[in-house]
Amino acid sequence: MAKSVLKAAPVVVGLTALMERHADALSSQLQAHHLKVFPPHSEKGIRTFGPSEASKLLGVGESYLRQTASEMPELNVSMSPGGRRMFSIEDIHVIRKYMDQVGRGNRRYLPHRRGGEQLQVISVMNFKGGSGKTTTAAHLAQYLAMRGYRVLAIDLDPQASLSALFGSQPETDVGPNETLYGAIRYDDEQVAIERVVRGTYIPDLHLIPGNLELMEFEHDTPRALMNRKEGDTLFYGRISQVIEDIADNYDVVVIDCPPQLGYLTLSALTAATSILVTVHPQMLDVMSMNQFLAMTSNLLREIENAGAKFKFNWMRYLITRFEPSDGPQNQMVGYLRSIFGENVLNFPMLKTTAVSDAGLTNQTLFEVERGLFTRSTYDRALEAMNAVNDEIETLIKKAWGRPT
């Protein structure tokens, strides 16, 4: 008679230990992937631009760009294999400054804020993941900087996807007190906001990175409310307070908000002059946005009653991941326009493999090389992205009272 073989009892692993183990394993693999894509001595950067794209970024005709470039012998412009001039983002930055100095008439080529124009703080938000919130914030910040504005991008999402897109890995490149939390925390370890601002590979675009440390603000705030002293700034005013300290350095601040309604998001809303809500045109996403709007309005009413003051210029809904050939999506877009009217941006951001494939290597459309895609795929994606960002730039100009 064969002896029965006793099977060893399965090892019971605690949930906390299992999640820690998986987090460590995934973190090390992500770091290895980052090093493979961007070796230690390589740097992220914006691709070069031909004369047509460069002239559009500068807001001039190609002939004037050629004439100006010929007047600048110090300009070392690269050449394409076909013999075309290719301009780096640094070249465009230098040319813009030169044009502003020697330009004819009253034409201004540096679009910096002028006397009386208020710093524009745009909070990009949504309650539901997958709406393209971070992709929108990243491309908007880069586009405005490439157009000559002085831009600060703030990653307020503990997942820190915006930081990763800009080359700052949250696990390895962002230390304690190096997120916005360091500048808005309640204790004696608070630092000046200048300490957490870092440069990027685009002239006049700065970043305040994020990581999981931002969650500490959600934990600290209830204690701070209980132990509040006379003169303490409440949670909803802390972001606007520190932004005010560096307002003179920037024209636009773009905040990538967390995908939930916590103290961080409410503070970002209070600091904002404008709100951009991303929405995927499907029923579940729209239902989620309805809950988001209802909860947000209730909470903002409570904050207003507590003394908060809002500096509001505009609020817009951006349709994202839009497929023009999808009938139900077109119906949903029409439904949203019938309810919200002009508060829905005219141009949607299309669903395209160019954006998703660029994201696999933590790059934006302005960074990834056009040659990696079929020309029609890339050009279609870039045209849609530029149309969205140009419409937002127009809203910024209107808020300043400038002609558009």
From Swiss-Prot:
Domain of life: Bacteria
Coiled coil (UniProt feature): none
GO biological process, one term: DNA replication
Pfam families named among the record's database cross-references: AAA_31 (PF13614)
InterPro entries: AAA_dom (IPR025669), DNA_Partitioning_ATPase (IPR050678), P-loop_NTPase (IPR027417), Plasmid_partition_RepA (IPR017818)
S-S bonds: none
UniProt KW keywords: DNA replication, Plasmid, Plasmid copy control
Its biological purpose: This protein is coded by a hairy root Ri plasmid. It is possibly involved in regulating the plasmid copy-number.
Name the UniProt record assigns to this protein: Putative replication protein A
Protein species of origin: Rhizobium rhizogenes
Lineage: Bacteria, Pseudomonadati, Pseudomonadota, Alphaproteobacteria, Hyphomicrobiales
